[in-house]
Amino acid sequence: MELRSTAAPRAEGYSNVGFQNEENFLENENTSGNNSIRSRAVQSREHTNTKQDEEQVTVEQDSPRNREHMEDDDEEMQQKGCLERRYDTVCGFCRKHKTTLRHIIWGILLAGYLVMVISACVLNFHRALPLFVITVAAIFFVVWDHLMAKYEHRIDEMLSPGRRLLNSHWFWLKWVIWSSLVLAVIFWLAFDTAKLGQQQLVSFGGLIMYIVLLFLFSKYPTRVYWRPVLWGIGLQFLLGLLILRTDPGFIAFDWLGRQVQTFLEYTDAGASFVFGEKYKDHFFAFKVLPIVVFFSTVMSMLYYLGLMQWIIRKVGWIMLVTTGSSPIESVVASGNIFVGQTESPLLVRPYLPYITKSELHAIMTAGFSTIAGSVLGAYISFGVPSSHLLTASVMSAPASLAAAKLFWPETEKPKITLKNAMKMESGDSGNLLEAATQGASSSISLVANIAVNLIAFLALLSFMNSALSWFGNMFDYPQLSFELICSYIFMPFSFMMGVEWQDSFMVARLIGYKTFFNEFVAYEHLSKWIHLRKEGGPKFVNGVQQYISIRSEIIATYALCGFANIGSLGIVIGGLTSMAPSRKRDIASGAVRALIAGTVACFMTACIAGILSSTPVDINCHHVLENAFNSTFPGNTTKVIACCQSLLSSTVAKGPGEVIPGGNHSLYSLKGCCTLLNPSTFNCNGISNTF
């Protein structure tokens, strides 16, 4: 491009220097004494014959001071460039050796943690035992994961000859194994019954009865695959045996229950700050419901960290290998131990449109037969034994698979493989604080749902009882009530779980509450009976039983530990339909069967608890007390003291000289118990001396 300069009038402080040499830039054209003079280029515009665009050139002239400033700026730029170069060098080194640096940092942290654990064990091993056990378990599982990820194929190749040999003889070998296990259980029950009583046999008969009922009303009784059924019941029995009958298992779960209870008590700090120091005056609203908020927050944080997914995968893998259930069923069943019936399907949400009807039924059954970790804390706050609630949550997972595969057997080939099912989504939170906030916020709907349902159901229950009493009064039977009807409907089921006969009607009432309302109402009534028993109140008042025995409490705790109620039916249908709209018809058609299967799964868990419960059955106190105070029999024995305590707690004193012994005992036995124990809570002077 060719540029032509044009003439322009010279003015003060202005010159056309667009194409002057560098020496002209230093010329001082303004003599007025200014420190610096700037020259601006005049725009040269020339329209050439080739129609080139216009071009503007601007040149700025600098003074000596400006040159000094420019030199300072150059030095700063050089310094900044040096820092940037060093920073880039460090970043490049970190990126290049990222793996090594990460290993070094984790090694330092792990070494510091191990030093802390060893120091704690040296100072007081008994005090540091929980920390030691947790550390050993964590190291074992981390090493196991590392070895399995690296050497899984080699281990599989090593075990393949034994697997082929086992498969070739499995047809007759499986019958030998199962027959041996059944005979072992029968002999064990025989010896155990001789020691503890005959109630264990009733629970065993109840378990057989529920299995037969599920088989008779099965969707496809001729297509039942018995491996998941038998292994599900077997896992139940093994877990119950480990927890309820072995000292290490019982101590471990009892310790775990106490730790959970202590952990939940930290909710009181937030509740007292928000609601005031007298928040316990409104126990359920301000004491129980905040526990749901706190537990939901903690579960959300654990889910963000990936700990929940890791545990669920491990438990699901165990059930997959043992029961032979599909990967989807195993993951959801294990997830229901920790999360609720609408949260656990989220673990496998991408695969819901492709699962079979039997798998869909198993997913719903698992939700009905277990409870969520968030409401577990609320039940513990009622006073229900935490160790039994935790045990019931774990035992119900394999029970749900056994009941589901028996009530709706698999008739199709599952499409989802193990590798796909074990890929679970992590939380969508950006950091741990956001996860905690989302967990607390998500509990709002749960807390509101619990509160409004309790208000509605208890009000409805009161109205139903009033209406039934009004109706019964027309036939001279004003005591007709919803509880009475349920006690007769569900009494056979509660008795076959192993509940004592006199308690079976009261436990049947709890089952009615749980089925037609929800488990909160049932556990609330159970907690009242537990508190009455612990306070040593009379067992009978005006001939009406006030609470149940410890064994019946334990069995009821297991039977009620599930979401199997009519209200949850709508929740499950709505939740699963929103995740898989294409399966709406299948979900609706299988929901009622899943509700029944979930209820029976809870009953089966209660039967296992009844078989394994080591709580001694009631002694024949009539015979013991009538003979204890004769001269030929010793009076102060363990059985006599236990019978006397039961007699005194069930005795009703209406006034001086008007005492009614509990349990149809005689005044002679009551007088002897007063002489033996000299109780401070009972006035023995009111007993008549004439028998």
Curated annotation (Swiss-Prot):
Q: Which residues cross the membrane?
A: 103-123, 129-149, 174-194, 198-219, 228-247, 285-305, 362-384, 387-408, 444-469, 567-577, 591-613
Extracellular-side positions: 124-128, 195-197, 248-284, 385-386, 470-507, 528-566, 614-691
Query: Which terms in the GO cellular component ontology are assigned?
Result: brush border membrane; endoplasmic reticulum membrane; plasma membrane
Enumerate composition-biased segments (Basic and acidic residues). Answer: 43-54
Family matches, as InterPro entries? C_nuclsd_transpt (IPR008276), C_nuclsd_transpt_met_bac (IPR018270), CNT_C_dom (IPR011657), CNT_N_dom (IPR002668), Gate_dom (IPR011642)
UniProt feature, compositional bias: Polar residues: 31-42
One Pfam family matching this protein: Nucleos_tra2_N
Provide the residue span(s) of the region labelled Disordered: 1-78
Q: Which reaction does it catalyse?
A: thymidine(out) + 2 Na(+)(out) = thymidine(in) + 2 Na(+)(in); cytidine(out) + 2 Na(+)(out) = cytidine(in) + 2 Na(+)(in); uridine(out) + 2 Na(+)(out) = uridine(in) + 2 Na(+)(in); adenosine(out) + 2 Na(+)(out) = adenosine(in) + 2 Na(+)(in)
Mind listing the UniProt keywords for this protein, alphabetically? Cell membrane, Endoplasmic reticulum, Membrane, Symport, Transmembrane, Transmembrane helix, Transport
Which residues does the entry place in the Cytoplasmic compartment?
A: 1-102, 150-173, 220-227, 306-329, 349-361, 409-443, 578-590
* GO terms of molecular function: nucleoside:sodium symporter activity; purine nucleobase transmembrane transporter activity; purine-specific nucleoside:sodium symporter activity; pyrimidine- and adenosine-specific:sodium symporter activity; uridine transmembrane transporter activity
Q: What induces it?
A: Up-regulated by phorbol myristate acetate (PMA) in HL-60 cells.
Intramembrane positions: 330-348, 508-527
Tissue specificity here reads: Expressed in pancreas, bone marrow, trachea, mammary gland, liver, prostate, and regions of intestine, brain, lung, placenta, testis, kidney, and heart.
Q: Where is the composition biased (Low complexity)?
A: 21-30
Top-level taxon of the source organism: Eukaryota
Similarity remark:
Belongs to the concentrative nucleoside transporter (CNT) (TC 2.A.41) family.
Quaternary structure, from the entry: Homotrimer.
Q: What does this protein do?
A: Sodium-dependent, pyrimidine- and purine-selective. Involved in the homeostasis of endogenous nucleosides. Exhibits the transport characteristics of the nucleoside transport system cib or N3 subtype (N3/cib) (with marked transport of both thymidine and inosine). Employs a 2:1 sodium/nucleoside ratio. Transports uridine. Also able to transport gemcitabine, 3'-azido-3'-deoxythymidine (AZT), ribavirin and 3-deazauridine.
What name appears for this protein in its UniProt entry?
Answer: Solute carrier family 28 member 3
What organism is the protein native to?
Homo sapiens
